[in-house]
UniProtKB/Swiss-Prot annotation:
Protein name (database record): 15,16-dihydrobiliverdin:ferredoxin oxidoreductase
Organism: Prochlorococcus marinus subsp. pastoris (strain CCMP1986 / NIES-2087 / MED4)
Gene: pebA
NCBIfam families linked to this entry: PRK13246.1
Annotated GO biological process: phytochromobilin biosynthetic process
Domain of life: Bacteria
Pfam families: Fe_bilin_red
């Protein structure tokens, strides 16, 4: 599941003359003890994005997970793209969160880089779930227009692909239109991306999920050396 989403990201990175990077075997594909859960990962980079990662978790009919995060290079104050999608097969429930995660909460910054999410939300009302805003910290690395969906099989089949593609395409377009920094210098950008990784490594809700399936040792290594590498290694 979600192969089309992965391929869409990959194609767009290739259009930017980006490339897929080699990653260690332990992260490229990892199975839990009884192989009921399989996690696969990819990393890409381009001139515009120093790291664009994808994670897919295959739990068969019970659970399917897709996550992608794009880090602009340190010369760009552009937000970090973040998308989490979970499909719970037993209950037939979809949970998805999409956002252009801002490096700062300055009003003019948010308006310039993140406000176009509102246009996408207006097209897909199912992704405008105000009841779930307690699941994130609005004062940290989330925009006022974060898109949240708690949906069903119909939303999975009918809406998800279209809204994900709009979300990614819009992000790429905005980045092309705004090449000049207005709010942050290089050192501030780097420090904010480091803080983002530290914050995310501590707060990531997938931590418990991964520990349940793959154990604490592997999960800690995965979080610090694949997902959020700036948490403990500021130069990576």
């Amino acid at each position: 599941m979600f192969e089309s989403l992965k391929n869409f990201v990959k194609t767009n990175i290739e259009d930017l003359d980006g490339k897929e990077l080699e990653i260690s075997k332990e992260f490229k594909e990892h199975h839990n003890k009884d192989s009921k859960y399989i996690i696969k990962n990819w990393i890409f980079e381009s001139q515009q994005y120093r790291k664009w990662r994808i994670t897919k978790l295959d739990g068969g009919d019970k659970l399917q997970v897709f996550n992608t995060v794009a880090y602009p290079n340190f010369k760009s104050e552009f937000p970090i793209l973040g998308a989490d999608i979970l499909w719970f097969g037993t209950s037939q429930k979809l949970l998805a969160i999409f956002d252009y995660q801002p490096l700062i909460q300055e009003k003019k910054y948010l308006q310039k880089y993140c406000s176009s999410l509102d246009f996408i939300k207006n097209q897909y009302s199912v992704f405008d779930n105000h009841k779930m805003k307690n699941i994130y910290d609005s004062k940290k690395y989330f925009s006022p227009w974060v898109m949240i969906c708690r949906g069903n099989k119909l939303n999975l089949d009918r809406d998800l692909n279209n809204i994900f593609c709009s979300f990614v395409s819009n992000y790429l377009t905005i980045n092309k239109l705004h090449q000049n920094n207005q709010f942050l210098d290089l050192e501030q950008i780097k420090n904010n991306q480091i803080d983002y990784d530290k914050y995310s490594a501590e707060k990531d809700p997938a931590d418990k999920l991964f520990k349940t399936f793959f154990g604490e040792t592997w999960t800690e290594n995965f979080i610090n050396n694949f997902l959020f590498t700036l948490n403990h290694n500021p130069l990576k």
